[in-house]
Amino acid sequence: MGGIFGVASKSSCVLDLFFGIDYHSHLGTRRGGMAVYDPEKGFDRAIHNIENSPFRTKFDRDVSELQGCLGIGCISDNEPQPLLVRSHLGNFAITTVGKINNMDELIEDCFKNGHTHFLEMSGGNVNPTEMVASLINQKASILEGIRYAQEKIKGSMTMILLTPEGLYAARDRLGRTPLIIGRKEGAHCVSFESHAYINLGYEDEKNLGPGEVVFVTPEGIEVLQKPGDKMRICSFLWVYYGYPTS
């Protein structure tokens, strides 16, 4: 399992991002990561191993060094992320939570389509988040790429992409894992679990439906793809992994 969180704010997002990710610590024990965007400094990222120390301890120093009004991050039980990507779609960061059951098939398809290599290897396997980025980059726009990734992946994949303009948030096409939008004055957040933003002053704004894609800025949200009509939630998340107040 794992948890993801993102913030689009008119002021610095770093503290909200830090605590929002930390509130997902019950969902993973291996890696934690933060990525932010600042118009002057560009993209910046920090990833740490949290197997022997909690997220809050490992990232305490990064909070004072990272700058930006837009950011995403994660608690991961598997691969290191978020990843920073440069492609024909521009520069973006991406974080995901889910499981790809047809990874070998997707790797072969990528090689046939001219993709020459994968850089991020985790435990001898291709990093699933890099695979998602590779699928997105095969299309003419980020939205088309997200749709394509949702169609090609057998399993489950929920994601947040960070661009210089805002955040793309996409829930798994069958709604197996949740994604929720919160709001407060001057900011919006995207969260895997709702309890992560309640203590940060956010209020519930929107629960994304299965396969729904939205674009998030400090001013508001824009629905780019409406939700589907089929829902298959991960009941194990609700009864075991999930935090009770969510």
Where are these regions (language model features)?
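Conserved short alpha-helical segments that host acidic/polar catalytic motifs at enzyme active sites
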Residues: 1-246
